[in-house]
Amino acid sequence: MKHVLISGCTRGIGAACVKKFLLNEWVVTGMGRSEENPFPDYSSIFHYVQGDLSSTEDRKRFVMEAFYKFGKIDALVNVAGVAPLERKDLLEMTEESYDRVMDINTKGTLFLTQEVAKKMIENPIQNGIRGHICNISSLSAYTSSTSRGEYCISKAGVSMITKLFADRLAEYGIPVNEVRPGIIATDMTSKVKEKYDNLIDGGLLPIARWGEPDDIADAVYALCSGALPYVTGQSLDVDGGFHLRRL
């Protein structure tokens, strides 16, 4: 069985990704901040590591436990991410909020990818591939939102992480891609549901509905399944057509 690591696995997009891989007969090691295992009924094929992505020790422990539990790592899905605790105008954004968001979303993603990549490079090559890495970015990587500037900057950083590792790891047969979710029904967007309901009703999206975590999980699995071995450094917009920027 193939083995995938998924950060931010306890809810929303991360939990949907866990389910998608389990249904396709992968074993999964997941990390999240919750003390409670989100999938206690799947102990033979799911291993949970409680930890904080911004912590160097927790990242290393996550990879170590994954490797000792299920062996070689075939895929990494970087889902873990946070929004600012409070939306503030760009002119009022604090260093504390910036540091918190960047430490998890960007720094954590960068150094977890680095840690896993070193393991993947040692994998035997099969059909030209040693492993797959998929980052979860956001439409905020290229869309200005001045009430949560730290989040936009962090996700733009994730997009560059994708490009950098795609370039660096191509010689080893490790494609690195990202999925850019649009307006997805998760805990993160629940606080602004009315705002986005009105925008969608007003024609913001060609596909006029909220996205679901399963929409993202389907795209992630496609990129990690081996079905697209000649694709790397690609950003896949799963956003109902938001990126079309219609007039």
Q: Where are the model-predicted features located?
A:
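Conserved glycine-rich cofactor-binding loop
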Residues: T10-R11
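Substrate-binding pocket helix/loop in short-chain dehydrogenase/reductase
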Residues: R87-L90, T94-D99, D201
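Active-site helix of classical SDR
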Residues: T113, S154-G157, T162
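Alpha-helical segment proximal to the catalytic Tyr-Lys
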Residues: K118, D167-E171, P229
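Short C-terminal tail/terminal secondary-structure segment
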Residues: G203, Y221, T232-L247
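A conserved structural motif in NAD(P)-dependent oxidoreductases
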Residues: L205-I216
